[in-house]
Amino acid sequence: MPPIGTFNTMRIVCISDTHSMHRQIEVPEGDLLIHAGDCLGAGTLDDVADLNDWLGTLPHRHKIVIAGNHDWVFQEAPDHARELLTNTNYLEDSGIEIEGVRFWGSPWSPTFMDWAFMQDRGDAIDRYWQPIPQDPNVPITHLPLKPLSRRPRIKRQRTTSAA
């Protein structure tokens, strides 16, 4: 692999679902670290401060964080949680351009169980997903933008043979 920073490239490292166990993982080198949600376990402001401190120790030039369905504090105390994130760019239905690459982050997911950042399918969630620009190079969400249940189904045919 060429060294990081050569050939006008950006090496992006994406992690998610660390659930406050971020200090226990090895993060590969890169230019940009994306944490795509479920950063927290219990989801307290102290957990956010610890996440921020950890992010500050990583060598990546740029960092982006979005919330996920376990990251309640970003929904219940959003201003306080965001204030604690000084070592990253927190995206919530917003975007940023880094080195000419456009990123857009959204924490919203179709409702399943009773988690944070959930909206019912259809108009409710579309209210959050429709504003996503058509031109981000990298959309970042905690779950797929197009739920798997909307994928076309492939009809399979079983065959048996006598041996």
Describe the function of each predicted region.
Residues 19-20, 71-72, 108-111, 144-146:
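Short, solvent-exposed loop/turn segments at secondary-structure junctions
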Residues 40, 45, 112-113, 135-163:
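Active-site-proximal segments of metal-dependent phosphoesterases and phosphodiesterases across multiple
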Residues 10-18, 34-36, 100-109, 137-142:
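Active-site-proximal beta-strand elements of phosphoester/diester hydrolases
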Residues 19, 25-27, 116-135, 141, ...:
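Active-site-proximal loop/helix segments of hydrolase catalytic cores
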Residues 15-98, 161:
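Core catalytic region of metal-dependent phosphoesterases/phosphodiesterases
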Residues 45-49, 122-126, 158:
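Structural motif corresponding to alpha-helix initiation and N-cap regions
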Residues 1-9:
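Short, Lys/Arg-enriched N-terminal segments with co-localized hydrophobic residues
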Residues 81-107, 111-121:
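Helix-adjacent hinge/juxtasegments
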